[in-house]
Amino acid sequence: MKEYAYLIYQLKDPMESNYAWMNWKTAKREFNPVHYDGVYYGHIEGNTSESVLEKLFEKFNINQPDDFKGHSLSVSDVVVLFDHNGCKWYYCDRFGWENITRDILER
């Protein structure tokens, strides 16, 4: 297992964006990180980014840390995972997670 750092982002104001709670296929056309606030930072162990994302989804829906002030993880939330290779951004989709590619982040 390896250790990951993670940062959870949630929409500042879901009514300001046209993609709150939308699937990634729809949201990626207008996705913009400026619509988000970082709401929690932590560390977690896992074998793969996929297993870590599933652990985080369970943790922040079933057994939230006392100092977590956001809502349960749901569609349109973003998790950034950091490991020794750098970071990757993931969008919580209706069924699983979608990688947010660099070209979308940089437009």
Positions of PLM-derived features:
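Short intrinsically disordered terminal tails
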Residues: 1-2, 105-107
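Extended boundary segments
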Residues: 1-47
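Broad hydrophobic/π-residue packing in well-ordered secondary structure
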Residues: 3, 7-11, 53, 90, ...
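Short, conserved turn/kink motifs that form compact alpha/beta structural patches or helix kinks used as
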Residues: 33-82
